[in-house]
Every structure is written in C-alpha cells, then in structure tokens.
Curated annotation (Swiss-Prot):
Any GO molecular function: structural constituent of ribosome
BP term (GO), one: neuropeptide signaling pathway
Keywords, in A-Z order: Amidation, Neuropeptide, Secreted
Record organism: Nauphoeta cinerea
Task performed by this protein: Mediates visceral muscle contractile activity (myotropic activity).
Pfam families for this protein: Periviscerokin (PF08259)
Span of the signal peptide: none
InterPro entries associated with the record: Periviscerokinin (IPR013231)
Subcellular location as annotated: Secreted
Major location (coarse): secreted
Name used for this protein in its record: Periviscerokinin-3
Domain of life according to the entry: Eukaryota
Length: 11
C-alpha cells in the first residue's frame, strides 16, 4: 500500500 503496490495491506 505504501509503495502503491497492490494488493499490499495499508497497515
């Protein structure tokens, strides 16, 4: 999420 790489969790 932080790098904008889905589906990475934004925790």
């Amino acid at each position: 999420g932080s790098s904008g790489m889905i589906p990475f969790p934004r925790v």
